[in-house]
């Protein structure tokens, strides 16, 4: 019955091939670990006038967040490995972020318990070297 009432040929209820497939999240489709749905919800709730947010926008923002997180964690892990410890602390995050020029310009926040970067003024170093030469 193509034009009248009754059973239709297409549709979700009767198809067997869709019943065997598991649902895939937006994150799984995009190959991401961070949740696209949660990021989209945050974007919708935090925009003024409850503006509409596209699905691709949420995927792009999620991908950027995941990339930046992976970059910071990799550098902080290297800093922790250099100091021969197995746990990443705020100090390692501080050393990683301030050691990378691009991340330093991007993240201008103060990291709690991060400490300061080790740096000795050049004028002080020159005085110490001159004293060693005079003593020798």
Swiss-Prot record:
Residues 1-13 have a biased composition (Gly residues). Signal peptide: none annotated. One of its GO terms (molecular function) is protein heterodimerization activity. InterPro entries: Histone-fold, Histone_H2A, Histone_H2A/H2B/H3, Histone_H2A_C. The keyword Acetylation applies. Acetylated once deposited into chromatin. The modification N6-acetyllysine is found at residues 5, 12. Belongs to the histone H2A family. This is Histone H2A.Z. The gene is htz1.
